[in-house]
């Protein structure tokens, strides 16, 4: 009888601990979603307000060419940020079975345009963005260029956001032959920024996850970037490796299979 009582007590304690863990998980998930919605509300309003403000200034000063150009650039930067945010949300909520795009595109053009946006972001933050290597055997590929932009922009964007004025971000792109006509694109991004703790790295690819949750807004984001990166890399059969330490920067290495194409890229929509 004593042994049965002890077994029963052990089961009750184990069950109680399991319940406590489930409550902790549910509470953490609820807090993360609350933070996400609060940050999203701010991050959506901020670029919209910037765009509206810049358009109003342009309307009042149409003859001031320098001011108009400056306002246009700021409005375009805010619009790109808003579009990237919307794309991230749509990507996370897209069914995995949804067909992936198979559009001919020029990889060099896509990378240069993406890097142009990242350079503007880096300049604004006082961070030096350097392209150390851009070695491509092919110009044209078949696929969805948006996914490549999202992967690279989210990783480079985080490297800039969590850096400091005077810091640096170095990235490289190198294509290599694989098998059966498929090539591999290796993308490496390293920085000397804040880095990530071992604890955070265990769940850094979860949606809403942030090392510093109080760093929302245009500089800190809402914790979707790395979740989007992991989803896109996995969907395309790629790999991602991370080497980071708190206060010592971060190094990302992404390898993606790529299909070369002889077809001409489609013209961009106006």
Residue ranges and their predicted role:
Residues 95-103, 140-143:
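Conserved micro-motifs of the catalytic ATP-binding
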Residues 103, 112, 123, 128-139, ...:
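Conserved catalytic submotifs in the C-terminal HATPase_c
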Residues 232-233:
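Detector for a conserved hydrophobic position within an alpha-helical segment of the HATPase_c
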Residues 74-82:
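Short alpha-helical segment of the dimerization/phosphotransfer core of two-component systems
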Residues 220, 225, 229:
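Short alpha-helical Gxxx[C/S/T] motif in the catalytic ATP-binding
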Residues 15-60, 79:
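Primarily the dimerization/phosphotransfer
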Residues 196-208:
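Short conserved segment of the HATPase_c
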């Amino acid at each position: 009888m004593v042994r049965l009582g002890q077994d029963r007590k052990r089961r009750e304690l184990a069950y109680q601990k399991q319940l406590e863990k489930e409550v902790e998980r549910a509470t953490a998930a609820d807090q993360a979603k609350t933070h996400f919605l609060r940050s999203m509300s701010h991050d959506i309003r901020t670029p919209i307000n910037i765009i509206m403000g810049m358009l109003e200034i342009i309307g009042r000063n149409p003859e001031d060419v320098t001011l108009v150009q400056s306002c246009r650039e700021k409005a375009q930067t805010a619009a790109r940020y808003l579009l990237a945010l919307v794309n991230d949300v749509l990507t996370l909520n897209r069914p995995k079975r949804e067909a992936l795009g198979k559009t001919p595109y020029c990889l060099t053009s896509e990378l240069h345009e993406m890097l142009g946006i990242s350079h503007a972001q880096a300049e604004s933050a006082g961070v030096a963005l350097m392209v150390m290597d851009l070695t491509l055997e092919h110009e044209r590929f078949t696929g969805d260029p948006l996914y490549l932009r999202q992967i690279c922009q989210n990783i480079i964007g985080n490297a800039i956001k969590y850096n400091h004025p005077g810091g640096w971000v170095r990235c490289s792109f190198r294509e290599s032959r694989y098998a059966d006509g498929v090539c591999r694109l290796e993308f490496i991004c390293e920085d000397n920024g804040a880095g990530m703790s071992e604890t955070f790295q265990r769940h850094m690819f979860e949606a809403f996850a942030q090392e510093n949750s109080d760093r929302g807004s245009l500089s800190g984001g809402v914790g979707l970037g790395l979740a989007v990166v992991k989803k896109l890399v996995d969907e395309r059969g790629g790999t991602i490796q991370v080497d980071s330490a708190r206060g010592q920067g971060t190094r990302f290495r992404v390898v993606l299979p790529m299909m070369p194409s002889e077809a001409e890229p489609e013209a961009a929509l106006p």
